[in-house]
Amino acid sequence: KIVGESYPFNEKSHFLLLADNHNSVNGIRQFCLSKGGKVTYAPIYYQDLTIDENFLKEQLEDASEFDNKLLAFPAQSNVSGVKHDLDWIKKAQDLGWDVLLDAAAFVPTNRLDLKEIKPDFVSVSFYKIFGYPTGIGCLLVNKEKFKKLRKPWFAGGTVSLVSVNTIQHFLINNHERFEDGTLNYLDIPAIKIGLDYIENIGIKRINERVASLRKYVFERLENLKHENGQSLVQIFGPKNHQNLGGTIILAFYNKDGIRYEFEQIEEQANQFNISLRSGCFCNPGIDETNNCLTDNELATYYSSHQEGDYKDMIKFLGKMRGATRISVGIATNQNDINQLINFLETLLNQ
């Protein structure tokens, strides 16, 4: 939000995103649109869920008429676990783009070397790294781009001087101008404890553990077949599983090849005390791609509704939406995966 409201969008701006961005990043587009700027999404490939790099390259190169150009780039998909090529950051910057790197899904299990990769802005969520506290994030800003962010309002703790009679104010000339109100000083000390905990384990060890568990999950899932040969599980994402994080997106099918609704899988998993995430995971781009929702279908729905929700759209379109996501991370062990497989085996031959 800080980048969105403070970036100098205008009618000659271009905001470029991937269709694999989280809604926390997608929302920035409203700031650009409100100033008359252009918003473009680089698509991802169906089922493979990797970037259409030719499209992205064309958009980056064909932008000479724009003044302020911002690329929002996810280091890793929060849904599929796909790690996008970070070389695009420098490629974009060399063409005059500023780059906002969403590293929230990446840094819990990967090292982000900011001496090598130099985005202009980086967003991080601490609770996704070590589970606590929620509600405290981090925005890293390249010092050279700090003054480019023009905060449009102020609140307590962000100003050095305010006048009521002349309606003038001066913002604090450092990062405090973006820290509205009283900081959450009761929870902030937990961040140091969490970071020390991760450092003691070692991010390299965490990365290797997640890779090992991910490989084991894939092997077990791919062997789940009904007696007639129909696969129980469809795994979305690239065939090469090497460059993936710890999240895996799935769909499930009965013996006749009919897809289960994701709510049904989640409800049955709950009976086994297994917590699964289902829905669109705050990432509508992957959901729309995987479920083959066309631009015309989506435009028709939104133009005929003043409000709506997930279930209403499913009913209107007559198409399946959503999927199921499983995650492996620092707290996961092989027994957790075995319990998941034991549950899924109860769905076989049904």
Where are the model-predicted features located?
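Pyridoxal 5′-phosphate
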Residues: 1-350
